[in-house]
């Protein structure tokens, strides 16, 4: 299996397939010259399909390596049909031989696509040039430490490719130069205004049809292409939509996104709304998530909800909680899980873990003690 960050293909759209000076995606054209939203969205879908093909190739290469170099005979003794066939699980001896890569970032993509369609193509409040510039500068925040390091590395690589001598002094000089780069006051004002406009645009997780449509469709751009692929064990690829906790470190490798998310911050968790963007209550959030096509996500989904203990206190609180769960599954949701703990407790537990041996925090398929 693998983790698939659905924000990365959109980064490649804005960079015409380039990443840190390297052509890692396909060329989908200059984003500032895409005259319609459909043209922009098609570019995202093309980058998505190409990135999926890269992931499948990597997954299958690892499968072959495991079969040839790392067979696990003890595991085979406990997996149905391996002994009968005389093959380990890695060699295709199991009854079921699926590969299940997990995608995440649906909320970021739904919010990003909706914001771009509305602000750039429908209301024409901002140009795509300004949007692209704002993402490059991380909106009003400017370049963070990782962006500085990445840009310096790209410049040094370009110098080496051009035949220039690069040494420690050169690297220091480039780093210091990049660190001094800052957006102008005019740019900061422009990017702040854009970020404020993005904040006002409706977000996934509030039972708003148009935004929820994008979430459902973005999920399809990941799940449907995977269905045509098979692994060396003879099994089919089955999509999942859950990150465990990979949305945090992989978000740390992802630049700013058009939904207003700042560079190198966590990507949305599983099929859950982006943090703090579901402002119409838990029932609305559950309604939005239930509008995804859960039937095609045969490897599972992850929907996290968090409650303050007071929200579920007493019989009335418990009855509302039960009603929420029943409603979600009546609407064909697949999975939901909960944390019922207040922020102060979590912060204190970080400082004094010895006082909280009883504290359980649900993560994804497991709970942390």
Regions found by a protein language model. Name each.
Residues 52, 56-69, 83, 87-91, ...:
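Internal maturation/activation junctions in enzymes
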Residues 265-267, 271, 277:
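Aromatic/basic-lined ligand-recognition segments
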Residues 1-159, 167, 274-369:
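Structured mid-domain segments that build the active-site/substrate or prosthetic-cofactor binding neighborhood
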């Amino acid at each position: 299996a693998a983790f698939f960050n659905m924000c990365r293909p959109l980064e490649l759209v804005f960079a015409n397939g380039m990443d840190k000076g390297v052509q890692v995606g396909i060329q989908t054209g200059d984003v500032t010259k895409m005259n319609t939203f459909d043209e922009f969205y098609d570019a995202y879908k093309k980058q998505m399909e190409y990135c999926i093909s890269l992931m499948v190739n990597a997954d299958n290469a690892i499968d072959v390596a495991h079969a040839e170099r790392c067979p696990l005979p003890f595991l085979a003794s406990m997996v149905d049909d391996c002994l009968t066939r005389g093959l380990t699980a890695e060699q295709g001896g199991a009854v079921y031989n699926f590969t299940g890569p997990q995608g995440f970032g649906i909320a970021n993509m739904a919010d990003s696509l909706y914001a771009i369609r509305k602000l750039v193509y429908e209301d024409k409040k901002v140009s795509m040039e300004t949007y692209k510039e704002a993402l490059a500068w991380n909106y009003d925040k400017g370049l963070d430490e990782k962006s500085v390091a990445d840009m310096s590395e790209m410049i040094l690589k370009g110098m080496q490719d051009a035949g220039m001598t690069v040494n420690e002094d050169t690297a220091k000089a480039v780093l210091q130069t990049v660190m001094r780069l800052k957006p102008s006051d005019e740019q900061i004002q422009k990017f702040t205004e854009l970020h404020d406009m993005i904040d006002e645009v409706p977000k996934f997780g509030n039972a708003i049809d148009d935004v929820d449509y994008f979430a459902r469709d973005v999920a399809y751009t990941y799940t449907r292409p995977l269905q045509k692929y098979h692994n060396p064990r003879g099994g089919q690829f089955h999509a999942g939509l859950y990150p465990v906790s990979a949305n945090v470190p992989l978000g740390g490798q992802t630049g700013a996104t058009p939904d207003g998310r700042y560079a190198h911050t966590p990507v949305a968790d599983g099929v859950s709304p982006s943090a703090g963007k579901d402002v119409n209550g838990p029932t609305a959030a559950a309604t939005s998530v239930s509008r995804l096509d859960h039937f095609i996500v045969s490897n599972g989904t992850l929907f996290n909800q968090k409650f303050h203990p007071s929200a579920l206190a007493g019989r009335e609180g418990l009855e509302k909680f039960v009603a929420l769960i029943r409603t979600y599954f009546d609407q064909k949701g697949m999975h939901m899980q909960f944390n019922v703990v207040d922020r102060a407790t979590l912060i204190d537990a970080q400082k004094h873990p010895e006082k909280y041996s009883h504290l359980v925090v649900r993560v994804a398929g497991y709970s942390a003690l």
